[in-house]
């Protein structure tokens, strides 16, 4: 499969590749079966299995914010370790990484679990923190050093464009830095190259979205009006997903699948570069368009493929996109990822229809 999976993840992949589950069975399995969600606590303990994890985290958080309430900090750390919550701010993830002496790669993974993206090497703070992680520095050193740097120029999100190769060029430039003096020089020299939004993810988003806005290719000569964001939302993203904001009585799986589900406002903001592209949206666009944006032949369209072959092909394709965007790869023990992997094995219906059938069963009665 190209990516090493744990035994539990491998079991899920085998289950998905069997082709034996109807949408009703898939929904029931996610809701009531033996599906084992991978939580933040499991990932955290896999990166730092020692018994002093709670003490180290609490001490590090208090050192970073001496005015914090020790009881509140202790409660936050316990909730992380016991799987009741996870950090949602990348700043907190970096604090954890420094506290546990995690490597840059381990920090990248932890960020992906919490924020959709790994270290963003076009983000000024991220590259500084990554450098201090690589060189064995402390969180307070990294934070104070970053605070001493010149402010980044304000960039209008709608105009934040340019070569998508800049991120890798920046990463390579900072890998050549060997002292805080060089770090400051490199940072100042690249002030105009920094930005908050991810360009590669936006590139995929626009290609997929353009396919939905202009469903009839120009070369056909057929006339069809462009779809509005409202129409796209209704036609493609509704998928029988409950619109109510109330989640009272919902299961964990229901909450996870509903979380960050796109709406019209979100699509408009992302299109206008006012917000980043969420990982879930990118996966949904892959399913909705079936990754067909250029009309080229793809073997995944052929009926002779077995469910396993079809799943393998989409597994490689999706993971290549996610990796290119700086997002974590597919995890068969993630509820949304599992649903996406189930959808891409569709043969007699479209991927989005297959996904919608599962969602209908999962949210029946809501």
Predicted features along the sequence, with ranges:
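Extended, solvent-exposed, polar/acidic, compositionally biased regions
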Residues: 22, 33, 353-366
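Short amphipathic recognition helices of helix-turn-helix/homeodomain-type DNA-binding modules
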Residues: 28, 94, 104-159, 300-350, ...
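Short, basic-rich loop-to-helix N-cap that marks the start of a DNA-contacting helix
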Residues: 84-99
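Recognition helix of helix-turn-helix/homeodomain-like DNA-binding domains
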Residues: 62-88, 113-116
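Long, charge-rich C-terminal accessory regions
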Residues: 158-330
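Short, leucine-enriched amphipathic alpha-helices that occur as contiguous helical runs
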Residues: 37-41, 74, 125
């Amino acid at each position: 499969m190209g990516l090493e999976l744990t035994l539990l993840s491998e079991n899920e992949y085998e289950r998905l590749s069997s082709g034996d589950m109807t949408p009703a069975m898939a929904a029931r399995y996610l809701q009531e079966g033996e599906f084992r969600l991978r939580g933040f606590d499991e990932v955290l303990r896999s990166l730092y299995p020692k018994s002093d994890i709670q003490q180290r985290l609490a001490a590090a958080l208090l050192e970073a914010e001496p005015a914090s309430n020790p009881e509140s900090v202790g409660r936050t750390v316990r909730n992380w370790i016991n799987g009741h919550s996870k950090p949602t701010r990348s700043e907190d993830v970096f604090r954890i990484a420094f506290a546990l002496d995690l490597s840059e790669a381990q920090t990248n993974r932890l960020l992906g679990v919490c924020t959709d993206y790994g270290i963003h090497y076009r983000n000024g703070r991220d590259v500084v923190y990554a450098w201090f992680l690589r060189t064995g520095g402390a969180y307070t050193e990294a934070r104070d050093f970053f605070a001493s740097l010149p402010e980044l120029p304000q960039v209008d999100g709608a105009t934040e464009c340019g070569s998508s190769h800049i991120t890798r060029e920046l990463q390579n430039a900072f890998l050549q830095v060997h002292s805080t003096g060089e770090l400051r020089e490199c940072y100042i020299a690249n002030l105009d190259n920094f930005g908050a939004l991810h360009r590669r993810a936006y590139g995929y988003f626009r290609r997929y979205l353009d396919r939905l806005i202009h469903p009839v290719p120009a070369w056909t000569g057929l006339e069809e009006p462009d779809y509005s964001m409202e129409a796209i939302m209704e036609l493609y993203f509704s998928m029988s997903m409950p619109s109510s904001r109330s989640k009272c009585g919902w299961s964990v799986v229901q909450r996870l699948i509903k979380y960050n589900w796109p709406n019209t406002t979100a699509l408009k903001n992302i299109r206008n570069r006012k917000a980043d592209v969420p990982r879930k949206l990118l996966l949904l666009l892959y399913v909705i368009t079936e990754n067909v944006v250029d009309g080229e032949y793809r073997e995944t369209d052929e009926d002779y493929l077995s469910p396993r072959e079809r799943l393998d092909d989409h597994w490689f394709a999706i993971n290549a996109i996610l990796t290119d965007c700086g997002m974590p790869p597919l995890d068969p023990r993630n509820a949304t990822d599992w649903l996406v992997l189930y959808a891409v094995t569709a043969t007699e219906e479209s991927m989005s229809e297959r996904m919608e059938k599962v969602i209908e069963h999962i949210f029946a009665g809501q």
